[in-house]
Amino acid sequence: MTTTRTERNFAGIGDVRIVYDVWTPDTAPQAVVVLAHGLGEHARRYDHVAQRLGAAGLVTYALDHRGHGRSGGKRVLVRDISEYTADFDTLVGIATREYPGCKRIVLGHSMGGGIVFAYGVERPDNYDLMVLSAPAVAAQDLVSPVVAVAAKLLGVVVPGLPVQELDFTAISRDPEVVQAYNTDPLVHHGRVPAGIGRALLQVGETMPRRAPALTAPLLVLHGTDDRLIPIEGSRRLVECVGSADVQLKEYPGLYHEVFNEPERNQVLDDVVAWLTERL
């Protein structure tokens, strides 16, 4: 089965140009996936994911978040999670109009997982299935209370202020993945800015209260050796959601990007199998 990728764009809030890709299989689609990538990266790092989904008969839509990759806006600059969820909602709307009647799957990794979670509790009628990979739903656990308070304040006043350095070697045990990430011109290699820190704290601090609104089937993927987003947040998430069909798939020894680990094919097979059972 052949999957074709096309690039498009739309005007997001504030008239920011949002670039997105669509991966279309050459057969009638079984469902539509709308994907949100993580902090600092871009949609095309998920080309192999979309190709695997395409082989299963799924159309995939994936945007470069504002301030990321090919999209417009100041680099990784945001003040509120709603800026991301609004763009994501626009893309879900496009996918829904272009494939009416198809089930909608929302998929997010890391920061994108936090975005998809926030979107899911706000718009529970806009999707049918949710898949989260190492979701950033407990950012408050990653910093001290003092740093959290500072990030929430600075995120409003100086949202572009770099506040947190990341260890990029922690994304994958595959050295080729790390090298490609470090040399990718579309990837932001700087520190996490205060605005994004504030946005993710918004998600994490409200997660236990808002998670019961998630009632659709949910699959959460997480490597047990993830040093960037520890697995404990995912374990708490699955205990809080309102869905009767929820599964946390823990991958022993895997790092942050389970889709880019040496075991990536098994992870993708697990995702496709889970989705296929529910379509």
Curated annotation (Swiss-Prot):
InterPro entries: AB_hydrolase_1, AB_hydrolase_fold, Hydrolase_4, MAG_DAG_Lipase
Keywords, in A-Z order: Cell wall, Hydrolase, Lipid degradation, Lipid metabolism, Pharmaceutical, Secreted, Virulence
Function: Involved in the hydrolysis of exogenous host lipids during chronic infection. Catalyzes the hydrolysis of both monoacylglycerols (MAG) and diacylglycerols (DAG), with a preference for MAG. It hydrolyzes 2-MAG, 1-3-MAG and MAG with short, medium and long chain fatty acids such as 1-monobutyroyl-rac-glycerol (MC4), 1-mono-octanoyl-rac-glycerol (MC8), 1-monodecanoyl-rac-glycerol (MC10), 1-monolauroyl-rac-glycerol (MC12), 1-monomyristoyl-rac-glycerol (MC14) and 1-mono-oleyl-rac-glycerol (MC18:1).
Subunit architecture: Monomer.
Catalytic activity: a 1-acylglycerol + H2O = glycerol + a fatty acid + H(+); Hydrolyzes glycerol monoesters of long-chain fatty acids; 1-butyrylglycerol + H2O = butanoate + glycerol + H(+); 1-octanoylglycerol + H2O = octanoate + glycerol + H(+)
Pfam families, A to Z: Hydrolase_4
SUPFAM superfamilies named among the record's database cross-references: alpha/beta-Hydrolases
Biological source species: Mycobacterium tuberculosis (strain ATCC 25618 / H37Rv)
Family the UniProt entry places it in: Belongs to the AB hydrolase superfamily.
Protein's name in the database: Monoacylglycerol lipase
Subcellular localization: Secreted, Cell wall; Secreted
